[in-house]
Curated annotation (Swiss-Prot):
Protein name as annotated: Peroxisome assembly protein 12
Topology in membrane: Multi-pass membrane protein
Topological domains, Peroxisomal matrix: 1-24, 82-106, 185-253
Domain-level remarks: The three subunits of the retrotranslocation channel (PEX2/prx-2, PEX10/prx-10 and PEX12/prx-12) coassemble in the membrane into a channel with an open 10 Angstrom pore. The RING-type zinc-fingers that catalyze PEX5/prx-5 receptor ubiquitination are positioned above the pore on the cytosolic side of the complex.
Length: 359
Protein backbone atom coordinates (compact mmCIF):
# COMPACT_ATOMS: atom_id res chain seq x y z
CA UNK A 1 0.00 0.00 0.00
CA UNK A 2 2.77 2.39 0.96
CA UNK A 3 4.61 1.53 -2.26
CA UNK A 4 1.53 2.41 -4.29
CA UNK A 5 1.09 5.73 -2.48
CA UNK A 6 4.77 6.56 -2.97
CA UNK A 7 4.54 5.79 -6.69
CA UNK A 8 1.48 8.00 -7.08
CA UNK A 9 3.24 10.84 -5.26
CA UNK A 10 6.26 10.57 -7.56
CA UNK A 11 4.03 10.51 -10.62
CA UNK A 12 2.17 13.62 -9.49
CA UNK A 13 5.39 15.47 -8.72
CA UNK A 14 6.66 15.05 -12.27
CA UNK A 15 5.00 17.69 -14.43
CA UNK A 16 4.14 16.34 -17.89
CA UNK A 17 5.49 18.11 -20.94
CA UNK A 18 3.05 20.61 -22.39
CA UNK A 19 1.40 19.44 -25.59
CA UNK A 20 2.68 21.29 -28.65
CA UNK A 21 -0.18 22.76 -30.65
CA UNK A 22 -0.13 24.13 -34.16
CA UNK A 23 -0.92 27.84 -34.58
CA UNK A 24 -4.31 28.91 -35.85
CA UNK A 25 -4.76 30.24 -39.35
CA UNK A 26 -5.32 33.73 -37.92
CA UNK A 27 -1.93 33.65 -36.20
CA UNK A 28 -0.34 32.51 -39.46
CA UNK A 29 -1.98 35.28 -41.47
CA UNK A 30 -0.88 37.89 -38.92
CA UNK A 31 2.67 36.51 -39.00
CA UNK A 32 2.79 36.56 -42.80
CA UNK A 33 1.42 40.11 -42.95
CA UNK A 34 4.12 41.29 -40.56
CA UNK A 35 6.80 39.45 -42.56
CA UNK A 36 5.73 41.08 -45.84
CA UNK A 37 5.51 44.55 -44.28
CA UNK A 38 9.07 44.67 -42.92
CA UNK A 39 10.77 45.27 -46.26
CA UNK A 40 8.52 48.12 -47.55
CA UNK A 41 8.54 49.74 -44.11
CA UNK A 42 12.34 49.78 -43.99
CA UNK A 43 12.52 50.92 -47.61
CA UNK A 44 10.23 53.82 -46.80
CA UNK A 45 12.40 54.71 -43.81
CA UNK A 46 15.60 54.61 -45.90
CA UNK A 47 13.94 56.74 -48.57
CA UNK A 48 12.99 59.27 -45.92
CA UNK A 49 16.55 59.32 -44.52
CA UNK A 50 18.04 59.66 -48.02
CA UNK A 51 15.92 62.75 -48.56
CA UNK A 52 17.42 64.52 -45.52
CA UNK A 53 20.90 62.92 -45.46
CA UNK A 54 21.72 62.08 -49.09
CA UNK A 55 25.47 61.79 -48.52
CA UNK A 56 24.95 59.09 -45.90
CA UNK A 57 21.88 57.17 -47.04
CA UNK A 58 21.62 57.75 -50.80
CA UNK A 59 23.83 54.76 -51.64
CA UNK A 60 21.77 52.62 -49.24
CA UNK A 61 18.58 53.76 -50.96
CA UNK A 62 19.92 52.98 -54.44
CA UNK A 63 21.18 49.52 -53.39
CA UNK A 64 18.44 48.79 -50.88
CA UNK A 65 17.80 45.22 -52.07
CA UNK A 66 21.39 44.16 -51.46
CA UNK A 67 21.63 45.87 -48.07
CA UNK A 68 18.30 44.41 -47.01
CA UNK A 69 19.16 40.81 -47.90
CA UNK A 70 22.33 41.06 -45.77
CA UNK A 71 20.30 42.48 -42.87
CA UNK A 72 17.58 39.86 -43.30
CA UNK A 73 20.10 37.02 -43.49
CA UNK A 74 21.74 38.07 -40.22
CA UNK A 75 18.36 38.56 -38.50
CA UNK A 76 16.79 35.28 -39.61
CA UNK A 77 19.95 33.27 -38.97
CA UNK A 78 20.12 34.64 -35.41
CA UNK A 79 16.51 33.71 -34.67
CA UNK A 80 16.75 30.29 -36.29
CA UNK A 81 19.91 29.44 -34.38
CA UNK A 82 18.70 30.70 -30.99
CA UNK A 83 14.91 30.36 -31.12
CA UNK A 84 14.24 27.82 -33.89
CA UNK A 85 12.00 30.22 -35.83
CA UNK A 86 12.06 33.28 -38.04
CA UNK A 87 11.81 36.76 -36.54
CA UNK A 88 8.09 37.15 -37.22
CA UNK A 89 7.30 33.57 -36.19
CA UNK A 90 9.03 34.11 -32.86
CA UNK A 91 7.16 37.41 -32.46
CA UNK A 92 3.87 35.48 -32.64
CA UNK A 93 5.15 32.72 -30.28
CA UNK A 94 5.79 30.08 -32.93
CA UNK A 95 8.66 27.69 -33.57
CA UNK A 96 9.80 25.44 -36.38
CA UNK A 97 10.05 21.68 -35.91
CA UNK A 98 11.86 19.41 -38.38
CA UNK A 99 9.38 16.95 -39.89
CA UNK A 100 11.77 14.01 -39.73
CA UNK A 101 13.47 14.43 -36.36
CA UNK A 102 11.10 16.64 -34.36
CA UNK A 103 13.98 18.92 -33.39
CA UNK A 104 14.22 22.68 -33.96
CA UNK A 105 16.15 23.72 -37.12
CA UNK A 106 19.08 25.20 -35.21
CA UNK A 107 21.67 23.46 -37.39
CA UNK A 108 21.96 21.32 -40.48
CA UNK A 109 19.87 21.06 -43.61
CA UNK A 110 16.65 22.42 -42.12
CA UNK A 111 18.28 25.71 -41.10
CA UNK A 112 19.93 26.14 -44.51
CA UNK A 113 16.68 25.41 -46.34
CA UNK A 114 14.80 27.73 -43.99
CA UNK A 115 17.27 30.53 -44.78
CA UNK A 116 16.85 29.88 -48.51
CA UNK A 117 13.05 30.11 -48.31
CA UNK A 118 12.99 32.99 -45.82
CA UNK A 119 15.75 35.15 -47.33
CA UNK A 120 16.88 33.84 -50.72
CA UNK A 121 13.56 33.27 -52.46
CA UNK A 122 11.96 36.66 -51.53
CA UNK A 123 15.07 38.40 -52.92
CA UNK A 124 14.95 36.39 -56.17
CA UNK A 125 11.19 36.89 -56.50
CA UNK A 126 11.54 40.65 -56.01
CA UNK A 127 14.25 40.84 -58.69
CA UNK A 128 12.15 38.77 -61.10
CA UNK A 129 9.14 41.03 -60.50
CA UNK A 130 11.26 44.09 -61.23
CA UNK A 131 12.61 42.47 -64.40
CA UNK A 132 9.09 41.54 -65.50
CA UNK A 133 7.76 45.07 -64.95
CA UNK A 134 10.72 46.59 -66.78
CA UNK A 135 10.46 44.27 -69.80
CA UNK A 136 6.70 44.64 -69.97
CA UNK A 137 6.93 48.44 -69.99
CA UNK A 138 9.71 48.45 -72.59
CA UNK A 139 7.87 46.20 -75.02
CA UNK A 140 4.43 47.76 -74.56
CA UNK A 141 5.41 50.44 -77.08
CA UNK A 142 7.15 47.95 -79.41
CA UNK A 143 6.30 44.85 -81.35
CA UNK A 144 7.90 41.59 -80.31
CA UNK A 145 8.28 40.62 -83.95
CA UNK A 146 10.49 43.64 -84.58
CA UNK A 147 13.11 42.34 -82.13
CA UNK A 148 15.31 39.44 -83.18
CA UNK A 149 17.86 37.33 -81.38
CA UNK A 150 17.96 34.71 -78.67
CA UNK A 151 17.94 37.32 -75.89
CA UNK A 152 14.68 38.84 -77.12
CA UNK A 153 13.09 35.39 -77.39
CA UNK A 154 14.10 34.55 -73.82
CA UNK A 155 12.72 37.88 -72.61
CA UNK A 156 9.45 37.26 -74.43
CA UNK A 157 9.21 33.77 -72.95
CA UNK A 158 9.85 35.14 -69.46
CA UNK A 159 7.18 37.86 -69.80
CA UNK A 160 4.67 35.21 -70.89
CA UNK A 161 5.53 32.50 -68.36
CA UNK A 162 6.27 34.46 -65.17
CA UNK A 163 2.62 35.46 -64.39
CA UNK A 164 1.58 31.79 -64.74
CA UNK A 165 4.35 30.69 -62.37
CA UNK A 166 3.20 33.22 -59.76
CA UNK A 167 -0.42 32.14 -60.21
CA UNK A 168 0.53 28.47 -59.80
CA UNK A 169 2.47 29.19 -56.59
CA UNK A 170 -0.47 31.16 -55.19
CA UNK A 171 -2.86 28.33 -56.10
CA UNK A 172 -0.68 25.75 -54.33
CA UNK A 173 -0.42 27.97 -51.27
CA UNK A 174 -4.20 28.54 -51.20
CA UNK A 175 -4.83 24.79 -51.48
CA UNK A 176 -2.43 24.07 -48.62
CA UNK A 177 -4.04 26.78 -46.48
CA UNK A 178 -7.48 25.27 -47.09
CA UNK A 179 -6.16 21.81 -46.20
CA UNK A 180 -4.54 23.28 -43.08
CA UNK A 181 -7.83 24.84 -41.99
CA UNK A 182 -9.59 21.48 -42.47
CA UNK A 183 -6.82 19.65 -40.54
CA UNK A 184 -5.83 17.74 -43.67
CA UNK A 185 -2.29 19.13 -43.75
CA UNK A 186 0.31 20.05 -41.16
CA UNK A 187 1.77 22.82 -43.35
CA UNK A 188 0.13 25.87 -44.85
CA UNK A 189 2.83 26.90 -47.32
CA UNK A 190 4.97 25.12 -49.94
CA UNK A 191 8.02 26.85 -48.49
CA UNK A 192 7.58 24.96 -45.22
CA UNK A 193 7.53 21.74 -47.24
CA UNK A 194 10.76 22.68 -49.02
CA UNK A 195 12.32 23.57 -45.67
CA UNK A 196 11.23 20.24 -44.17
CA UNK A 197 9.61 21.84 -41.11
CA UNK A 198 6.20 22.45 -39.53
CA UNK A 199 5.06 25.25 -37.24
CA UNK A 200 4.15 24.76 -33.59
CA UNK A 201 3.26 27.09 -30.74
CA UNK A 202 5.93 27.80 -28.15
CA UNK A 203 5.40 25.93 -24.89
CA UNK A 204 6.24 27.13 -21.36
CA UNK A 205 9.22 24.76 -21.48
CA UNK A 206 10.52 26.55 -24.59
CA UNK A 207 10.17 29.97 -22.97
CA UNK A 208 11.94 28.70 -19.87
CA UNK A 209 14.76 27.29 -21.99
CA UNK A 210 15.21 30.63 -23.78
CA UNK A 211 15.71 32.36 -20.42
CA UNK A 212 17.76 29.60 -18.82
CA UNK A 213 20.85 30.57 -16.84
CA UNK A 214 23.97 28.40 -17.29
CA UNK A 215 24.72 26.02 -14.44
CA UNK A 216 27.88 27.81 -13.33
CA UNK A 217 25.87 31.04 -12.88
CA UNK A 218 22.97 29.54 -10.96
CA UNK A 219 22.79 30.63 -7.32
CA UNK A 220 21.80 27.21 -5.97
CA UNK A 221 24.84 25.59 -7.55
CA UNK A 222 27.35 27.89 -5.88
CA UNK A 223 25.81 28.75 -2.53
CA UNK A 224 26.89 25.46 -0.99
CA UNK A 225 30.44 25.85 -2.24
CA UNK A 226 31.37 29.45 -1.72
CA UNK A 227 31.45 32.14 0.88
CA UNK A 228 28.89 34.88 1.37
CA UNK A 229 31.08 37.30 -0.59
CA UNK A 230 31.20 34.89 -3.52
CA UNK A 231 27.44 34.49 -3.31
CA UNK A 232 26.93 38.27 -3.58
CA UNK A 233 29.19 38.42 -6.63
CA UNK A 234 27.35 35.48 -8.14
CA UNK A 235 23.97 37.17 -7.75
CA UNK A 236 25.39 40.27 -9.43
CA UNK A 237 26.61 38.28 -12.45
CA UNK A 238 23.35 36.35 -12.46
CA UNK A 239 21.38 39.56 -12.88
CA UNK A 240 23.74 40.77 -15.62
CA UNK A 241 23.29 37.48 -17.44
CA UNK A 242 19.51 37.69 -17.24
CA UNK A 243 19.66 41.25 -18.58
CA UNK A 244 21.81 40.11 -21.51
CA UNK A 245 19.40 37.26 -22.23
CA UNK A 246 16.42 39.59 -22.18
CA UNK A 247 18.06 42.29 -24.33
CA UNK A 248 17.47 40.61 -27.74
CA UNK A 249 13.80 40.13 -26.90
CA UNK A 250 13.43 43.78 -25.91
CA UNK A 251 15.21 44.95 -29.07
CA UNK A 252 13.09 42.68 -31.29
CA UNK A 253 9.88 43.97 -29.71
CA UNK A 254 10.98 47.59 -30.15
CA UNK A 255 11.94 46.82 -33.74
CA UNK A 256 8.53 45.30 -34.48
CA UNK A 257 6.69 48.20 -32.84
CA UNK A 258 8.85 50.59 -34.87
CA UNK A 259 7.76 48.82 -38.05
CA UNK A 260 4.12 49.28 -37.10
CA UNK A 261 4.81 52.98 -36.51
CA UNK A 262 6.49 53.35 -39.91
CA UNK A 263 3.51 51.61 -41.52
CA UNK A 264 1.20 54.06 -39.80
CA UNK A 265 3.23 57.02 -41.10
CA UNK A 266 3.21 55.56 -44.60
CA UNK A 267 -0.58 55.21 -44.41
CA UNK A 268 -1.01 58.76 -43.16
CA UNK A 269 1.17 60.36 -45.83
CA UNK A 270 0.46 58.21 -48.90
CA UNK A 271 -3.29 57.57 -48.85
CA UNK A 272 -6.40 59.51 -49.73
CA UNK A 273 -6.84 60.31 -46.04
CA UNK A 274 -3.66 62.37 -46.11
CA UNK A 275 -4.85 64.27 -49.18
CA UNK A 276 -8.16 65.07 -47.50
CA UNK A 277 -6.47 66.36 -44.35
CA UNK A 278 -3.98 68.49 -46.27
CA UNK A 279 -6.42 70.22 -48.63
CA UNK A 280 -9.28 72.57 -48.01
CA UNK A 281 -8.16 73.68 -44.56
CA UNK A 282 -7.53 77.32 -45.40
CA UNK A 283 -10.70 77.80 -47.46
CA UNK A 284 -8.72 78.76 -50.56
CA UNK A 285 -10.16 77.86 -53.94
CA UNK A 286 -7.93 75.27 -55.60
CA UNK A 287 -6.35 76.07 -58.93
CA UNK A 288 -7.91 74.57 -62.07
CA UNK A 289 -6.64 71.14 -63.06
CA UNK A 290 -3.53 70.99 -65.17
CA UNK A 291 -3.64 69.69 -68.72
CA UNK A 292 -2.46 66.10 -68.35
CA UNK A 293 -0.42 65.82 -71.56
CA UNK A 294 2.00 68.59 -72.49
CA UNK A 295 3.50 68.87 -75.96
CA UNK A 296 7.26 68.96 -76.27
CA UNK A 297 7.06 72.32 -78.06
CA UNK A 298 5.43 73.79 -74.96
CA UNK A 299 8.19 72.34 -72.81
CA UNK A 300 10.85 74.02 -74.94
CA UNK A 301 9.21 77.40 -74.37
CA UNK A 302 9.48 77.04 -70.58
CA UNK A 303 12.40 78.31 -68.53
CA UNK A 304 14.96 75.63 -67.78
CA UNK A 305 14.20 75.79 -64.05
CA UNK A 306 10.41 75.39 -64.43
CA UNK A 307 8.48 72.19 -63.75
CA UNK A 308 6.40 71.06 -66.77
CA UNK A 309 3.51 70.08 -64.48
CA UNK A 310 3.07 72.96 -62.02
CA UNK A 311 4.80 75.50 -64.34
CA UNK A 312 6.64 76.91 -61.33
CA UNK A 313 10.24 76.85 -60.22
CA UNK A 314 11.21 73.25 -59.56
CA UNK A 315 11.51 72.00 -55.98
CA UNK A 316 13.49 68.79 -55.30
CA UNK A 317 14.49 68.11 -58.91
CA UNK A 318 13.51 64.62 -60.05
CA UNK A 319 14.17 63.12 -63.50
CA UNK A 320 11.88 60.59 -65.14
CA UNK A 321 14.03 57.78 -66.51
CA UNK A 322 11.80 56.84 -69.47
CA UNK A 323 11.78 60.35 -70.97
CA UNK A 324 14.63 62.31 -69.38
CA UNK A 325 12.48 65.29 -68.39
CA UNK A 326 12.94 66.89 -64.96
CA UNK A 327 10.03 67.76 -62.64
CA UNK A 328 9.29 68.65 -59.05
CA UNK A 329 9.41 65.49 -56.97
CA UNK A 330 5.92 66.01 -55.53
CA UNK A 331 4.41 66.78 -58.94
CA UNK A 332 5.85 63.84 -60.85
CA UNK A 333 5.36 61.40 -57.97
CA UNK A 334 1.64 62.19 -57.74
CA UNK A 335 1.25 62.19 -61.53
CA UNK A 336 2.97 58.84 -62.06
CA UNK A 337 1.07 57.24 -59.18
CA UNK A 338 -2.20 58.40 -60.77
CA UNK A 339 -1.64 57.97 -64.52
CA UNK A 340 1.36 55.58 -64.78
CA UNK A 341 2.91 57.47 -67.69
CA UNK A 342 5.14 60.42 -68.55
CA UNK A 343 3.15 63.69 -68.78
CA UNK A 344 5.19 64.79 -71.81
CA UNK A 345 5.84 61.72 -73.96
CA UNK A 346 3.07 59.44 -72.66
CA UNK A 347 5.50 56.53 -72.22
CA UNK A 348 4.56 54.06 -69.45
CA UNK A 349 6.22 54.95 -66.15
CA UNK A 350 6.07 54.19 -62.45
CA UNK A 351 7.71 55.42 -59.26
CA UNK A 352 10.69 53.11 -59.84
CA UNK A 353 11.64 55.33 -62.80
CA UNK A 354 12.00 58.45 -60.64
CA UNK A 355 15.60 59.58 -60.12
CA UNK A 356 16.23 62.23 -57.48
CA UNK A 357 18.81 64.83 -58.51
CA UNK A 358 20.93 66.16 -55.65
CA UNK A 359 22.82 69.20 -56.96
Amino acid sequence: MSTTIRASQLASSISPKTEEKQPSVFDIIAQENLATSIRPALQHLVKYLAFFKPKTFLSVHRNFDEYYIIFDLILQNHYLRNYGASFTENFYSMKRIASGTGNPPNDGRERIMSLITLVGWPYVENKLNQLYDRLKEVYECRSWSSINGMKAKCQKMFVIIWPYIKTALKAVKSALQLAYILNRSSIHSPWLYFSGVILKHLTPEDLEAFNAVPLHLQTGYQISRGTLNEHIHLRFFNRIWRFILGLPGIVSRLFAYGLFFVQFLDYMYNTDLAKLTKTGLDGAIPSPPHKMIISESEILSLDTNKCPICLKKRVNDTALFVSGYVFCYTCINQYVNTYNKCPVTGCPANVQHLIRLFV
